[in-house]
Amino acid sequence: MRIYRISHFADLSGDGGRRASARWHHKGRPVVYCASNAAAAMLEAIAYIARGDPALLPSTFQLLEIELPDDVNREIVSLDWLPADWKQNLAHTRSLGDNWLQLQATAVLVVPSALAPDTTHFLLNPAHPELLPPGQGKIHIVRVEQYPFDSRLFEGQVRKP
C-alpha cells in the first residue's frame, strides 16, 4: 500500500518528532507522520504547519509517496478505544502514541484523522527493527514531488509582508 507525507526532507528519520510535539506524541521522540492519501497529507500541512496561511508553507516542502508493505506489523487505534473528546484531549492521544513508541511492538500505528472523517494516518516508528536501517528497511520512499500545493488553494488570501 502507498502512504503519503509532506516534509522538507525526503527521509523517514523522524527528526521532526524530536523537535516538536504533535497529536500522537510528545517532543523528543522520533516519529514519522503519514496519511492514507496525498490530499489528507496536504490538508494536515495546511492546517498544522501553515495554519491556513500560504505564506507559511515553505517552498521546500515535498510530497513523499511511501511504500508500506502488507507484511509490516501495525497496530490500529479504533475510534471505539478513544474518549469522546479525543480530538481536544492531547494528553490522551500523546500518551497513547508515546507508549506505542516506547514498547516498539509494531513498526506502524494506524490512527484516525482529527481533520478528515473516515481518513487514517500512519505513524512510523523509525527505531523499530522493520524500519532499520533508515531508508533501507521494509518501508521506503518511492516518489518525491516538489511543492505539491496548487495556487488555487490560496486564491484571494492576502500574503503577509
Tell where the protein language model's regions lie, with residue ranges.
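Active-site and NAD+-binding cores of ADP-ribose-processing enzymes
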Residues: 2-17, 25, 52-161
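Extended catalytic/binding region for NAD+/ADP-ribose chemistry, centered on the ART fold
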Residues: 27-48, 122-130
